[in-house]
UniProtKB/Swiss-Prot annotation:
Superkingdom of this protein's organism: Bacteria
A Pfam family of this chain: Complex1_30kDa
Family annotation (HAMAP family): NDH1_NuoC
Family designation: Belongs to the complex I 30 kDa subunit family.
PANTHER family to which the protein is assigned, alphabetical: NADH DEHYDROGENASE [UBIQUINONE] IRON-SULFUR PROTEIN 3, MITOCHONDRIAL, NADH DEHYDROGENASE UBIQUINONE IRON-SULFUR PROTEIN 3
Subunit field text: NDH-1 is composed of 14 different subunits. Subunits NuoB, C, D, E, F, and G constitute the peripheral sector of the complex.
Gene that specifies this protein: nuoC
Reaction equation(s) it catalyzes: a quinone + NADH + 5 H(+)(in) = a quinol + NAD(+) + 4 H(+)(out)
Organism: Roseobacter denitrificans (strain ATCC 33942 / OCh 114)
Record key words, sorted: Cell inner membrane, Cell membrane, Membrane, NAD, Quinone, Translocase, Transport, Ubiquinone
Protein name: NADH-quinone oxidoreductase subunit C
Function: NDH-1 shuttles electrons from NADH, via FMN and iron-sulfur (Fe-S) centers, to quinones in the respiratory chain. The immediate electron acceptor for the enzyme in this species is believed to be ubiquinone. Couples the redox reaction to proton translocation (for every two electrons transferred, four hydrogen ions are translocated across the cytoplasmic membrane), and thus conserves the redox energy in a proton gradient.
InterPro entries the record matches: NADH_DH_suC (IPR010218), NADH_quin_OxRdtase_su_C/D-like (IPR037232), NADH_UbQ_OxRdtase_30kDa_su (IPR001268), NADH_UbQ_OxRdtase_CS (IPR020396)
Keyword hit for Transmembrane helix: no
Length: 199
C-alpha cells in the first residue's frame, strides 16, 4: 500500500513544487507539508488532477504548539474515493497569520473553518460567514488553545429565581488542585518475604 503512496507523493511534489515543502508516508497516509499562500491552488489541484482525484474534504482541524514561532498547524484531511487514498496537508502558521479559505473548492469547508476559528481563533480570509459555531454568542476565548484555562472564564446555569440562563464568573468550591494519578503499584520495588535472602 505504501508504494503507490510513495509514487503519489513524488508526483504531487513534482507537479506542485511551488507549495509542497516536504512529504512522507506514515500509517498508510500521505502527509504533505505545504505553504499557506498556495493552499487553495493545491487543494484544487488535488481535487481535479486525474492522478489524484481527492474529491472529498473529510475535515479541517488545527494543532496548537505554544513553544513554536509558527504556533499552529492547520491540518486538512482529503480522501480519494476513486483511488482509495488519503492525504493530510499540514500548514504551519503564526498566531497573527490568516489562512486562505478553501470554500471555493470544497463548499463543505464552510463549517470546518468556522469550527477551527471557534476552537483556535485562526482566521480564514475570504470566508463568507466566519462566526462561532460550537460555543455561545458571548463566549470569551478559544477553548482548544493550550493557554485556555481548563475551568474556563464563565459558567452558565439556569437561575430558577430569574427564570433565565445566567452567566457568572467561575467560582470553584475548592482551590484548584493538582492530583497525582500515578498508580502506587507502578514503579515501586517491593521486597516479598524470602526475597531479601537472594541479595
Amino acid at each position: 500500500m505504501s508504494e503507490p503512496l510513495q509514487e503519489l507523493g513524488n508526483y504531487i511534489a513534482t507537479k506542485r513544487a511551488d507549495c509542497v515543502l516536504a512529504w512522507d508516508v506514515t500509517n498508510k497516509e500521505l502527509n504533505l507539508d505545504v505553504t499557506p499562500s498556495n493552499i487553495v491552488g493545491l487543494v484544487e489541484f488535488l481535487k481535479t488532477d486525474a492522478t489524484c482525484r481527492f474529491s472529498t474534504l473529510i475535515d479541517i482541524t488545527a494543532v496548537d504548539y505554544t513553544g513554536r514561532a509558527k504556533r499552529y498547524d492547520v491540518v486538512y484531511h482529503l480522501l480519494s474515493m476513486y483511488q482509495n487514498h488519503r492525504v493530510r496537508l499540514r500548514v504551519s502558521i503564526r498566531e497573527d497569520q490568516m489562512m486562505p479559505s478553501v470554500i471555493s473548492v470544497h463548499p463543505s469547508a464552510n463549517w470546518f473553518e468556522r469550527e477551527v476559528f471557534d476552537m483556535f481563533g485562526i482566521l480564514f480570509s475570504g470566508h463568507p460567514d466566519l462566526r462561532r459555531i460550537l460555543t455561545d454568542y458571548g463566549f470569551r476565548g478559544h477553548p482548544l488553545r493550550k493557554d485556555f484555562p481548563t475551568t474556563g472564564y464563565t459558567e452558565v446555569r439556569y437561575d430558577e429565581a430569574q427564570k433565565r440562563v445566567v452567566y457568572e464568573p467561575v467560582s470553584l468550591v475548592q482551590e484548584y488542585r493538582q492530583f497525582d494519578f500515578m498508580s502506587p503499584w507502578e514503579g515501586a520495588e517491593y521486597i516479598l518475604p524470602g526475597d531479601e535472602k537472594k541479595e
